[in-house]
Amino acid sequence: MAGSPSRAAGRRLQLPLLCLFLQGATAVLFAVFVRYNHKTDAALWHRSNHSNADNEFYFRYPSFQDVHAMVFVGFGFLMVFLQRYGFSSVGFTFLLAAFALQWSTLVQGFLHSFHGGHIHVGVESMINADFCAGAVLISFGAVLGKTGPTQLLLMALLEVVLFGINEFVLLHLLGVRDAGGSMTIHTFGAYFGLVLSRVLYRPQLEKSKHRQGSVYHSDLFAMIGTIFLWIFWPSFNAALTALGAGQHRTALNTYYSLAASTLGTFALSALVGEDGRLDMVHIQNAALAGGVVVGTSSEMMLTPFGALAAGFLAGTVSTLGYKFFTPILESKFKVQDTCGVHNLHGMPGVLGALLGVLVAGLATHEAYGDGLESVFPLIAEGQRSATSQAMHQLFGLFVTLMFASVGGGLGGLLLKLPFLDSPPDSQHYEDQVHWQVPGEHEDKAQRPLRVEEADTQA
């Protein structure tokens, strides 16, 4: 391994060069392919003689604002629990999301809205891009503290492409319904990140174990992320559902599911906690599992009771996962899941997909009436039975797991390339490796950073 000067020079050049290249290439592609859609273009909109009040901006933008806040504030602050990694948690979330939303606009545009030689964008494409960024940030949670920014940008470059392809296969080729992304966002993002983490397994991570925990104020800041996500999750699930009853029902189901998952989390956390005390890790994360578990079925006729039951189940399963399964995941399967994305997004995402299979299989014309067309158009048109739709939903889950697993494996191999800057084993979960930290000179005088230390990878 090169010594400190060459390593510092490489770190100085890698990130700016990659950022400039990615932004430059994206800008060129935007110039060539991206155009306003008919609801955004001045000439096209006014030529159609619509009232301004009919523009989709007024129906979709409030949801977009909520989704945007979730991505940049909710996800960012949820990950600041690490005692010495707050700058990186929020800062790299900012960086990844800013790149992912541009790149996903292109990838999703080529797959979903490419006609006349151009990609046509509007507020719905902004929401879809944020959804994709959310999946990338979920994967980031699995490798938080163990990767550098250049590695993360390359991860996003690959993951956005696979996310777009998986989404296209599920929604357009298989006709799967997944309004809130239990499969396309949460399951995909979680298992992509978990497989990536397995490939990047660091057997000497014990050297940084003392930084992997939280302190009082870092947990408090992380709780800000939890509250933002909890408040805005109904908008997240409902952002792109059919206007009217469908969107209303989606928000309602998510609202009740989140409430039930919160009570389930508090109950289980106290039950399995030491001396009956609550664990803030459980509250920060498992309380949100209710939003994940109804992602697929929230626009369906789940019923308020069904939403409560699903949320409570997700909260309990997620809490038990944090308590018992995360240690097994690392010790037995060599998956170092920093944020526990398997418990918040992975297992609840799979449960949500299976719940969607069940609710889709129970769909009838009597239950949905004329609303069947907006929720299950293929059933309404007579092209599928409810049972067939349920089977397609189940197959969509397997397709998602396949794309996520293969993609995570490829991503891990990409990120292990020796010339990419990666923090040494003794400096994981440490902001000073990548950031100018206030007071770092005094800290270095006591504990100098050994940036020249060789990396150890399996």
From Swiss-Prot:
Originating species: Homo sapiens (Human)
Region (Disordered): 436-458
GO biological process: ammonium homeostasis; ammonium transmembrane transport; transepithelial ammonium transport
Record PTM text: N-glycosylated.
Record function comment: Ammonium transporter involved in the maintenance of acid-base homeostasis. Transports ammonium and its related derivative methylammonium across the basolateral plasma membrane of epithelial cells likely contributing to renal transepithelial ammonia transport and ammonia metabolism. May transport either NH4(+) or NH3 ammonia species predominantly mediating an electrogenic NH4(+) transport. May act as a CO2 channel providing for renal acid secretion.
GO molecular-function terms, A-Z: ammonium channel activity; ankyrin binding; carbon dioxide transmembrane transporter activity
Gene3D superfamilies (alphabetical): Ammonium transporter AmtB like domains (1.10.3430.10)
Cytoplasmic topological intervals: 1-13, 83-86, 146-149, 202-219, 273-282, 326-346, 415-458
Resulting phenotype, residue 421 to A: Partial loss of interaction with ANK3. Intracellular retention
Membrane topology: Multi-pass membrane protein
Subunit structure, interactors included: Interacts (via C-terminus) with ANK2 and ANK3; required for targeting to the basolateral membrane.
Family, per entry: Belongs to the ammonium transporter (TC 2.A.49) family. Rh subfamily.
Extracellular side: 35-61, 108-124, 171-178, 241-251, 304, 368-393
Compartment(s) where it occurs, according to its Swiss-Prot or TrEMBL record: Cell membrane; Basolateral cell membrane
One Pfam family cited in the UniProt record for this chain: Ammonium_transp
Name the record gives this protein: Ammonium transporter Rh type B
Effect of residue 419 to A: Loss of interaction with ANK3. Intracellular retention
Keyword ATP-binding recorded: no
Residue segments, region Interaction with ANK3: 416-424
Reactions that this protein is recorded to catalyse: NH4(+)(in) = NH4(+)(out); methylamine(out) = methylamine(in); CO2(out) = CO2(in)
